[in-house]
Every structure is written in C-alpha cells, then in structure tokens.
Amino acid sequence: MGQTLYEKLYNSHIIYEDKNTLPIIYIDLHLLHEVTSPQAFESLKNKKRIVHAPIKTFATMDHNVSTKTNKISASGKAAQIQMQQLINNCKDFNIKLYDLNHINQGIVHVMGPEQGLTLPGMTIVCGDSHTSTHGAFGTLAFGIGTSEVEHVLATQTLKQARSKTMKIGINGILKPYITAKDVILYIIKKVGTAFGTGYVVEFSGETIENLTMEGRMTICNMVIEMGAKSGIIAPDATTYKYLKNLPYAPKKEKWKNALEYWKNLKTDNDAKFDKIVKFDVSQIEPQITWGTNPSQTINITESNPDPKKINNIIDKQATEKALKYMNLKPNQKMINLVVDKVFIGSCTNSRIEDLRIASKIIKNKKVAKTTKAIVVPGSKLVKIQAEKEGLDKIFINAGFEWRLPGCSMCLAMNDDKLNRGERCASTSNRNFEDRQGRGGRTHLVSPITAAAAAIFGYFVDIKNIL
C-alpha cells in the first residue's frame, strides 16, 4: 500500500524505533524566538551540554518586540530580559540570530520561508504553535514546548508519536474578493476547533493548487485552530518558483537534485487516509468571527446566532458566554458594527501579498476618524519590498501607522494592545478572550475586510465597495 505525504516525511526521518517506546525522529530545522527559548538554554548550561547542530538552528526576535522602534529598551522589563538572553545564548552557542538591527529580522514563520530555510521534505520545529505554517512547502512542521526545545537543541532529535492522517480536499474557483483567510475560517466554522485533534492534515484540490505560497501559508498557519498537529501541502511548480534563488535554497546542481527529490513528495495514489473531508468554496462569502474562538464564524452579511435556538446545552452556554464577552446581541448583524482598531499583520497575514491586497482597498481613501489602524509587515524584507512598491505611502496617506516587523497586536505580549472594551478587526489567527489585550474584543477577518473596516470605521460587505 502507498504512503501519504505525511507518512513519507515521518518515516524517512525515523532514526530509532522499537515496540517499547515512541519513535525518535531527526529534526532538519529548529527555529527559535525570545519567548520559549530562555529556559531551554538555561537548562543546557546547567547540564553543561552543547547545541548539537548550530548550523540547523536559527533565531529571531518577534513576539514581544516593539514595532515602533528597533530598540530593545522600548519593551517592558521582562521582554528586555528575554531579548538580551537570546542575544547572549545565540552568541554562547554560535547560533545565527536575526536581532532587531538585522535586515532579516521578522516574525519567525515569515522569516524562515523567505530565507529559503524552509524547504520541502524537511522536519521543522519551533517553540510556537503556528509552526504549521511551514507545512505549506511540503514539510512536517509543528510547534513544541520548552522542554522539547531543549531536547532538540541538545540532540537534534525528538520523540514523536505517529499522527493520524486526514485529507481535506478544497475545490472551486474563489470569488475575486475571497482570500485564503476566508477559506480557512470557513472550514474551521464547518468542522469546529477539535476536529483535527491527533491528525496531520494534508490540503489538496483545485483551490489549493491555485493559491500563491502566501495563501497556502495562511491555510497551514490556521490548521492549528481546528485542533490539528500540523498541515501539509504537497510542493509543486508554485513552490519551486517561490524558493528559487532564496538565500538558503539549493543552488546550481544542488537545485536540480533537490527538484528531483521534491517532485516525489506527494501522496501515492493508493495511500489510505484515516479521514477524508471535501469542501466546495466557490460560493463562500467574506468570513468574520463573532465569538471567542475561530469556529465561531459567520458570513459577514449574516447575523450572530441566537442561543435560544440552540438545543445542545454546551453549545448554548458557549454562545451565551461569547456574545456577552463580545458585547453582542443574539441575531445582531455584523455589518455596520463599529471597530475601534484595525490590525493588519501577524504570521497569518503580514506578507507582501497581504499588504498589496489591503493597499488596493485603501488607496486614495482615508481611515475613519474614530478608528486607529496599524499595518505591521511580517519582516524587514517584506517592509523593504512594500516600500519599494510604494505601499507604505498608500497606507500612511490613508492614515494607517506603518510599523516595524513583529508579532505586534496578534497577542498582548508587547506594547501593541487593545484597551478594555475595544473592538478590533484583525488579520491574526486567534480571537480568544484577552488575546489582544485584557477585555479586548477580536474579530478575525481577511486583509481585504480589515482594510475596508478601517476606511468606514465599521464592518462592510466588501462586494458593495469594489
């Protein structure tokens, strides 16, 4: 019987296995940031261990950095300590670090792919749940905890149980105003936040094939929000074109050899998945979250659910709780709902394609006087490219704040936060209670919907303004 792409990746990286323990797999790339690495390095030092493969370990600063200045001193005390520790640890263990003054600095899941560090066939780990983003390149990529960070630093290996396999087929030509963000929110709405628990999900189908690498990364980034271990998309011509000539991508003869290998990274025709799901997304509309988890999503023209019409007591109580936190009423329309802030950024939607499509919406327009809007490029290279194209001027002239790279308002771990009661149109990946700031209310949307909300000061049906 044939193998799925996940099985090929997993099996080819097993370096030890017996019936009494979990298999041990080799890790090809280990990405670090300032938040989940300090304890791991401290433990290494206490045990007088070295980093096994510094050449396969790369670090950047992203989670708690200020996006207003590239000075560490602009962040809080705890953040300053974490960043300084990362500098010291990378120096002590000879690890490449893209610090705040480095041209390659950025969000770890933006930096890795754009440097060509993320290559098909790899196993990739990082102390961050959205490491699944890299699966868009045909890699087995997943987040790990701090103790596992230490283990990979010390051994370049990890004990890892086999996951179940799921195939999600996505077909249909998207409407011109629909993005990958709408697609993945739609799927999470349909299946829920626990549907993928225990699975690695392979995405395939016409829609996936037509997406850019940026769109594919958005899909794999948010597979975690349906409970999956990771997401994978088989590499193809789109992947190869993106990777060619990137700094760490293979060159010359090595490129030819790599292509031959990469073209075999696909699920065999006779492979068996544990679960198969199919979606037709040709008719979907812009998606928006109304509640406090990504599955609490509706079409932007729809109304919020009414708890009285929900029979399941658990779902009913969850709906009541979410509506209360979000200060929304049952059956309330999302259209015309006023937003206080707009955030375009995060490892989900901060790449050059995201900034381009948002800039088209706001060009020659002005941000509503009642709304504060910020755009945070995912990396310095994204920022530089956007400025070459004049996108920064479009955003600034419209009234957006044009920031430096970082995770920013995706999470309340830096100085970009929501105040209590503020409502935000956000292109990030999580809308949990207090995620963007204590008492803040997050609505997950695409860059197009977010840009439109900034101009009007409230949510609109994008079809009506194109």
Curated annotation (Swiss-Prot):
[4Fe-4S] cluster binds at residues 347, 407, 410. InterPro entries: 3-IsopropMal_deHydase_lsu (IPR004430), Acnase/IPM_dHydase_lsu_aba_1/3 (IPR015931), Acoase/IPM_deHydtase_lsu_aba (IPR001030), Aconitase_4Fe-4S_BS (IPR018136), Aconitase_4Fe-4S_dom (IPR036008), IPM_dehydratase_rel_enz (IPR050067), IPMI_cat (IPR033941). Its EC number is 4.2.1.33. Pfam families: Aconitase. PROSITE patterns: ACONITASE_1, ACONITASE_2. It catalyses: (2R,3S)-3-isopropylmalate = (2S)-2-isopropylmalate. Binds 1 [4Fe-4S] cluster per subunit. Keywords: 4Fe-4S, Amino-acid biosynthesis, Branched-chain amino acid biosynthesis, Iron, Iron-sulfur, Leucine biosynthesis, Lyase, Metal-binding, Plasmid. It is an enzyme of class 4 (lyase). Its cofactor is [4Fe-4S] cluster. One of its GO terms (molecular function) is metal ion binding. It comes from the Bacteria. Pathway: Amino-acid biosynthesis; L-leucine biosynthesis; L-leucine from 3-methyl-2-oxobutanoate: step 2/4. Heterodimer of LeuC and LeuD. Catalyzes the isomerization between 2-isopropylmalate and 3-isopropylmalate, via the formation of 2-isopropylmaleate. Belongs to the aconitase/IPM isomerase family. LeuC type 1 subfamily. NCBIfam families: leuC, PRK05478.1, PRK12466.1. This is 3-isopropylmalate dehydratase large subunit.
